[in-house]
Regions:
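Sec-dependent N-terminal signal peptides of Gram-positive bacterial secreted proteins and lipoproteins
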Residues: 3-26
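Feature responds to low-complexity, polar/acidic, surface-exposed segments characteristic
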Residues: 24, 28-90, 98-118, 127-157, ...
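Solvent-exposed, polar/charged alpha-helical surfaces in well-ordered, non-transmembrane soluble domains
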Residues: 90, 94, 121-124, 158-162, ...
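Eukaryote-specific, cytoplasm-facing alpha-helical/coiled-coil scaffolding segments in long proteins
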Residues: 190, 216-221, 312-318
Length: 452
């Protein structure tokens, strides 16, 4: 069967790309499927000036809260939950069960399933759903009084309120509303649900925020661990998937592939997210600082990826480093194993998301005739990023082929449809899928063979 060669976007193709005066980026793993129907509240994501409300807490740190629209969109996207305007106790219990960890032993019971969910029961159920019931039970009256500070809540539920406040399930303003024990509306129920999901580790999976100094430290801790392994292949322990990928290269179906551990996926909201690619961790840290300097606060996740492409002996560059290694896979067939990164950025609103493109073009893109211009460290001729939903007419649609096995996912981005040959080579042990994503104009030019 005739094998169609395709242009694949890889952060690892640095040497090859340098021949054309640019550095090449890497492909990112598949994000959550964006096609699911979202609640009407999602429409306001483009209208709100911000989704993040920063409120002080007793420790003096920032507590960031998403808007009602973002919470509703996320609950629908990842948990398929849309509350009725008048939420029942059973609705809330069912929703809480969906945000439990797969190995959770928490059991929930509603006293009156059909009754409207009220403030006191909502807090008690949320505390139980977050696995904190035993903690609440050991609260002394002295500790309860010190935490509640005048909130009019009595009886056993008072300990749940105190526990919810101390653990961040609710803030004081919201606790005052819930303490009135009135019917809980959909927005408040969703907010409580998202707080529980965050506690349970079933919501977003991220390094932090662009305005949090500790985000940089978390990124470097990850990077130091990767460097200590001294081998790019340490990022993927799945020999089955790697062998499939090498066969794809040997058959000429693709020129390279990337593999990521799907457990690192940020689980961000697709309509507010951009995936940005680079192979230099210093550059990524500077992008975070750039966003913060512009007043753009967004969620950040860094996902390292194992990138592989064919090596040609005439390149004469087989000296190994912690991020680069030439490996012989068959007679006269060599591959390069490299490490790259993609940074997931979930913006507060659509306006900030659109602003990202202009920022990168201004300070993180090389241009002919501007050799003396100050840029971020190791900026590329063609900075590259993508979205799993349409952005605007400056982004272009391409194919996204994925092959998964165990907890690992291989991605091959192409201009042409190569699903059929991938299915034939992947075998029955792997799952092959195809989708679409949208890439920025520089990424598009790279995939079409242009050098700037």
């Amino acid at each position: 069967m005739k094998r169609q060669r395709c242009k694949v976007f890889l952060v690892s193709l640095l040497l090859l790309a340098m021949l054309f005066g640019c550095a090449a980026p890497a492909a990112a793993p598949e994000a959550a499927t964006p096609e699911a129907e979202l609640p009407e509240a999602t429409a306001s994501l483009t209208a709100e000036p911000t989704d993040a409300v920063t409120q002080p807490d007793p420790l003096g740190t920032a507590v960031r809260e998403d808007s009602d629209a973002v919470n509703a969109a996320y609950a629908k996207q990842y948990f398929d939950i849309v509350f009725s305007e008048t939420v029942t106790q059973q609705e809330f219990v069912t929703a809480l069960e969906r945000v439990q960890h797969v190995q959770s032993t928490v059991t929930l019971a509603a006293a009156d399933a059909a009754a409207a969910l009220q403030g006191h029961s909502a807090v008690s159920l949320a505390v139980a759903g977050a696995g904190l019931a035993e903690l609440a039970a050991v609260y002394t009256q002295e500790k309860i009084d010190a935490t509640l500070q005048g909130l009019e809540v009595e009886g056993t539920v008072a300990a749940d309120f105190a526990c919810a406040l101390d653990t961040g399930l609710v803030n004081r303003e919201r606790a005052q509303v819930l303490a009135k024990n009135e019917a809980v509306d959909a927005a408040l129920a969703t907010r409580l649900l998202m707080a529980v999901a965050t506690h349970n580790g079933t919501a977003r999976n991220m390094m932090g925020y662009t305005d949090d100094p500790e985000t940089y430290a978390r990124i470097m801790n990850m990077w130091n661990t990767i460097m200590a392994a001294n081998d790019p292949a340490s990022l993927c322990e799945d020999e089955t998937l790697v062998n499939v990928g090498v066969q794809i290269l040997m058959e000429g179906v693709a020129t390279g592939f990337n593999i990521v551990d799907i457990s690192r996926d940020g689980r961000f909201l697709p309509e507010l997210t951009i995936n940005y690619f680079h192979d230099d961790i210093r550059h990524l840290r500077q992008v975070i600082g750039l966003l913060n300097s512009e007043g753009i606060v967004c969620k950040v996740q860094i996902n390292p990826e194992f990138s592989v492409y064919q090596y040609l002996p005439e390149w004469d560059d087989d000296e190994p480093t912690p991020t680069y290694k030439v490996v012989q896979m068959a007679e006269d067939f060599y591959v390069v194993n490299t490490i790259g990164y993609f940074m997931e950025l979930e913006f507060a609103n659509a306006e900030d998301r659109l602003a990202f493109d202009a920022l990168i073009k201004e300070v993180a893109k090389k241009n002919s005739g501007e050799e003396g211009k100050a840029l971020l460290h190791n900026s590329w001729w063609q900075p590259t990023y993508e979205s799993y939903v349409e952005v605007d007419d400056t982004y272009y649609e391409v194919y996204d082929q994925t092959i998964s096995h165990g907890t690992y996912l291989m991605r091959i981005g192409t201009l042409d449809d190569i699903l059929t040959p991938l299915q034939e080579l992947a075998g029955e042990d792997c799952t092959v899928a195809q989708g679409k994503y949208w890439i920025n104009d520089a990424y598009w030019r790279y995939m079409n063979g242009e050098d700037q």
